[in-house]
Amino acid sequence: MTVDQNAAAEPKEECRSVRILVVDDNPAVRHYLRALLEQQATWKVSDEARTGAEAIQRVTKNPPDMVLLDFQMPDLNGLDVARKISGLFPEIPILMVTIHLSKQLTDECRRAGVRGACAKSDVGSIVEAVDTLLHAGTYFPAMSSAER
């Protein structure tokens, strides 16, 4: 048996974790999103924020690879936070997660620099949206006339 010395000496490519900031004022929702995201081998919730101001501060201090952002928070709404983050760090994809998904909100999200939006209750959409955004895509589900 022969061993290829060059093959043995080659460094293995490391799988770098994708660092995700989860922003939601509800601790139960943050826990749910963390559990959902960390089922993926290379996705890691690197930080959490409870308010819009806290999210902006955390992104500025230690920019993540992606932001999952709640729309409705006590201080700033998700659109205001998204505008600020995308203005400072346009390369960071932002996914708006909300219980109030509508055609109007998705249009406003696009204008605010958000690259995707989905309902918090749709587990499959959240995973699909994160994956799409991490591969430089956008994710805005089609809205039926009843949802507009």
Language model feature labels by segment:
Residues 16-29, 33-37:
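Conserved acidic segment of CheY-like receiver
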Residues 51-54, 77-80:
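Acidic catalytic/metal-coordinating carboxylates
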Residues 62-68:
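Active-site beta3 strand of CheY-like receiver
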Residues 74:
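The feature encodes the CheY-like receiver
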Residues 91-102:
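A short, hydrophobic beta-strand element within the central beta-sheet of small alpha/beta folds
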